[in-house]
Amino acid sequence: MHPRDQTIFALSSGRPPSAIAVVRVSGAQAGLVLTTLAGKLPAPRQASRRLLRDGTGQPIDDAVVLWFPGPASATGEDVAEFHAHGGRAVLAALLAAISVIPNMRAAEPGEFTRRAFENGKLDLTEAEGLDDLIHADTDRQRRQALRQLQGLLGNRARDWRERIIEASALIEAGIDFSDEGDVPAELRAPAVKAIKALHVEITEVLAAQGHSERLRDGMVVAIAGEPNVGKSTLMNQLARRDVAIVSPHAGTTRDVIEVQLDLDGYPVTVIDTAGIRETDDPVEQEGVRRARARAEDADLVLWLVEGEQAADPASMRSLWTSGDGSHPSGGSVWIVRNKIDLGEFGDEGPQGEFGISASRGDGIRELVDALVKFSAEFFGTSEGALVTRARQRDLLRQASDSLRRSLELVGEGEELAAEELRSAAYALGRLLGRVDVEDVLGAIFQKFCIGK
């Protein structure tokens, strides 16, 4: 029996113990599972309280069951759900009772969602939105993922694809007239108009995305500087907990330490790095190497100095493996003066420099406010973004390029223009997951948890 013909089951809720646990079953045997464990089938889409029994008649649990006959279900197949008590022993007995029923097997990661995709319940962009929603850590990530799940990009892509196919039909119909002379204007003109409009729409979407793809992974901020200037103390202040060891001894931080922050809904990864200095200690040398590598990839570097100490350009240049002290990948660098409680310095100094006391917390609120403002500018207009993944951007760019080439060719050779339109429609079909996407399905659905 093909794996997709088997009925699958899995725990779909969180790890036990819990108050309630949900076990989901999908496939042709879902109804049999319900009747075997709970007696007769309940009314579709209505909760029913049942005493669950295993194959020998032994009671398992007093639970709520639901029945969703396909295709009107989440996966498009027959689906059964058991809402049982979330104790480990209860779930072990329930899953064991299901597993011994013929043609049953445990679901693989993301398999319920993959079956929903294969049965037309959602397209690939919506599946990606679901994946993002499951992994969202901040409210802005949640809102962006939910819009994708609700079809923000998928609906537009379907409309574009249908219009491309209509324009292609006009062009190809004109080819039939080629033996009799030029393609009739009543066929070419509306096709060209439609192609121009489509090209403009897709190009505008690509141009307006800003850092929307980055909202999924977040912005990276590296705290860097010479040893023992308070980098780890600042890290703990930003995290509001002790995540880094603080010591008066220089070189305490040997490895890169990361913490995930939610700054007004913006996902930010803050990195505490080893102090930048020349050293003979091989372990510290490796820490410095890693610090430089992560700082070079950061979107923003907070270069920490002590009080009124000048920000030594040579020290800052030493942070990068090459260059003149500016960020090698175009990121921003802020000077943050620590230990202002030991000298005269305001909350914010010249040229956007910040004054803080990491040990007392002075100036931290102002620094965080500046980070929130920087995050808003960095992520830009990602609130209504259509494109949230590199895969989506690449396929939209392919479609846009094909539309542009079709416009260039439509007056020279209708066959070539029609071929470019087919390429554009094909790219959008891949975007939606409707053509030739087997190579990406595994990569997407394997990231889902088991039971989803």
Curated annotation (Swiss-Prot):
GO BP terms: namely:
tRNA methylation; tRNA wobble uridine modification
Cellular localisation: Cytoplasm
Major subcellular location class? cytoplasm
Hydrolase: present as a keyword of the record? yes
Q: Where does Mg(2+) bind?
A: 232, 253
Identify which top EC class this enzyme belongs to. hydrolase
The residues the record assigns to binding GTP are: 228-233, 247-253, 272-275
Q: Which residues form the TrmE-type G domain?
A: 218-376
Named cofactor requirement(s): K(+)
EC number(s) recorded for this UniProt protein: 3.6.-.-
Kindly state what the record says about how the cofactor is bound.
Binds 1 potassium ion per subunit.
GO molecular function per UniProt: GTP binding; GTPase activity; metal ion binding
GO terms for cellular component: cytoplasm
Residue positions binding (6S)-5-formyl-5,6,7,8-tetrahydrofolate: 24, 81, 121, 452
Per UniProt, the keywords (alphabetical) are: Cytoplasm, GTP-binding, Hydrolase, Magnesium, Metal-binding, Nucleotide-binding, Potassium, tRNA processing
Q: Which InterPro entries match?
A: G_TrmE, GTP-bd, GTP-bd_TrmE_N, GTPase_MnmE, MnmE_dom2, MnmE_helical, P-loop_NTPase, Small_GTP-bd
UniProt xrefs under NCBIfam families: mnmE_trmE_thdF, PRK05291.1-3, small_GTP
Summarizing the function annotation, the protein's role is: Exhibits a very high intrinsic GTPase hydrolysis rate. Involved in the addition of a carboxymethylaminomethyl (cmnm) group at the wobble position (U34) of certain tRNAs, forming tRNA-cmnm(5)s(2)U34.
Entry similarity comment: Belongs to the TRAFAC class TrmE-Era-EngA-EngB-Septin-like GTPase superfamily. TrmE GTPase family.
**Record-linked HAMAP family:** GTPase_MnmE
Complexes and interactors: Homodimer. Heterotetramer of two MnmE and two MnmG subunits.
Name the record gives this protein: tRNA modification GTPase MnmE
Organism phylogeny: Bacteria, Pseudomonadati, Pseudomonadota, Alphaproteobacteria, Hyphomicrobiales
Q: Which gene encodes it?
A: mnmE
